[in-house]
């Protein structure tokens, strides 16, 4: 490799100081500008990094002992604190040849006491001599010819640098005067110019450094040497710190590059995403095929093994059962009629795995069901919720984290949409009971009379208050009150009754049932039903005659629910209200007559339905009593009944933090919130496609066929409802699925995302739930597509939902996928669509499955790693996993489809980065949005901020963190003390991404900073006199020392006691309501960080009018007093 010229070396050195780990593109551009190849530049950077930096590398080369002046000059040249310093050194180098003068070193006692470093060279050792071919410095004897050749080039370069430097100094002058100069430049300039503190730092430093040789005789030699030695030590520490930061940035850049490369694998096209047009064409094509189980029974009958009814016996004397002869085989519900005679499907040859091998997922199928219900909702409505993409394993892992950024952002989006739905329903003025759940209706009734609460919820929602707002919203919906639960049960009776008979709101049959049920035994005429608003909304027909014909045919088609009591009047049969269907009397052959009376029918107690007398006056009296009883119940239910908190997770939110909840309790919170959102107008009015071929169709019974339907429903159970579409989790258990329900996926959002493609160019598609189809047993197959890259489990797994008990399994290898395709029959309606969906994605899935298997085999050792101890650098924000759970999950993790790297270095590094992002999110969405912070009246230095390494709070003018020993700024008056501390106390920072010190809670630290900001924003007349004179200083110290919720509550209580209420009366624009609530509710509010944050937001809103109008203060006596007292305590 050819020798590089001095100019090339100098340019490489300058680029190296700016960026130690350049990208290949940057190295290529640098090589082109210098006339070097990429290989030469890369090799030079490798050798330069291996040699090391700073004093240590110079000592090893033998230059520091030979010429101390060269040592000092090299340090100044390598410093990156200022461009002006580098220019001054360059100008000093081109001055004529001077005789080298040796510098007198500091005495040994000074070195041993203040400068000695443990990692420095051994005292008394001699340095190696320079090799014979080493290149010497120009002023130590280089030829005059070489000097003359370099002078012109150096002069030209220095002149260009001087022009750029002067322009930069002029542009940065205003910023420097406002915020001060950097810590490295400030320290060097003040050390070299102790008597000049009121001049322009940028220009004067350049002039002083350029004329340093001429003015060197003015200062005593010993003082000058001491200042240089001190400046070199300070610059050395700054170089070490900046090099560490550059390493971290380079590691982060490499991670981003790897992430981009991973995303490019699926960037061009994702064949797994849902396609709405293909979905419609497929439904039209397969609608003509025969039902899958009817096809299966025909084949069994042809093979001589026909299915027989389980209750049919040859000894009964009957020569043939119409069910066994195939009359009922024309129904697609044959699997429900003969559940014990049909073989298992899919067979055992299709090997499936459990989704997760981690506790509690591997031992609690119910938790897995709830998890996939939540996942399905989030993936399906990701565009509506406006949440960023995430993978299934990231979401599952977030439940184990103590403070999860992902769960916080998702809850924030869900709450924003829920409040928007509540506001939309309140603006309409009337609550339609068409598709609103009982809990959502209770929430609307609670907020209807208190509009200010809704405004407060919407304006106060942020990253720290969402937990308390979630608790208040769920309590208002009736989850925390016993009487609200009774009310919800009363409101849900009609819904339960409809679900028992397979009716659905929004359909003609369901609305007719609701209207006739409300009229009791009197019923309604067909003309009255046709003119009802509930029927008009369905848009059946424009002509009244056609509407009446549709209603008449619907009522006459099911004689088990409706009976005709006159020529054009229908009512609901009384025996359909029986609690136990088996106890109801069976119909005789003539029970379908329209003249049948209800006297012969057995009825249940009045809890199900109240039979109203035929006397109209008595009926009106009872209706008034019922309405009065309901109105009183609503008033009572608006209060929070803390004696009956209801669900355990609600009590946990009231008495503790969200992070203290268990995994199951966090899931219950999600499910409750999703049940409320499912009834909102945003989700309810989505135009969702219907998978007609995959749903059990309604049994349209005419005439005596109604008896078959009722008798079969009494003997056999309907298939269970899917967790991912329909039914409330709380209050409605074990309900049968509506016969005309349909699976919901993301097919409808494909067009909506195409409109937003310009704003979301980083992802090929949004998060999606893709419904692939169902098999002959109504088992469903799903894809959950998260972030479109190779690390997403949804892009390489097919998720199986059982129709028997609702458990979930995963197909994650191509052998199982092809085995499933081999057992499916494309002649059936449902399996034909499933085959088409799987074959379309087969090659893509198999390739992703195969590549993942190779990756797992290479990194299999990660799954066997267990934490060596329970403590970690992030123990306060670590996950909730314990050693026993991890050890017990070792075996199950190997057989699970999705494996978590518990205890690995990569997992710890990812956890630390998530903690830092969570901390930034808390401060950005809570602290920085406070009016007291945005309109700060006090000095910038008189405010609290946090250390990004350990989250500890410090004042703006502090220099050093006492917990993690991070350096914020170099103190002007204590440079020597800082140098001693840097050499003896400060630990050497490694390039690891997780520290070994204690990490403090981000919530508590942000609360303390917010309290101090609000207290500082209030004027002197807003607080009692004794507070400003003596109590404030002690209160600030107590605030910084507080480390728990109880301690910070006591500190805030002292502050509340010092507030002048009269000032708040005149300050607030919102009057007595908000002011009284803030002052009076503080002692009784829950002792949680979220509740305290909500109280602070209310107080900040109350004083916002004054803070926005008040001018900033010029003098800060409190700041000066605080700084003086703190520095005196340091000494």
UniProtKB/Swiss-Prot annotation:
GO terms for biological process: flower development; regulation of transcription by RNA polymerase II. The keyword Nucleus applies. Residues 2-56 bind DNA. It comes from Arabidopsis thaliana (Mouse-ear cress). The lineage of its organism: Eukaryota, Viridiplantae, Streptophyta, Embryophyta, Tracheophyta. Residues 239-251 have a biased composition (Basic residues). It is found in: Nucleus. This is Homeobox-DDT domain protein RLT3. Pfam families: DDT (PF02791), HARE-HTH (PF05066), Homeodomain (PF00046), WHIM1 (PF15612), WSD (PF15613).
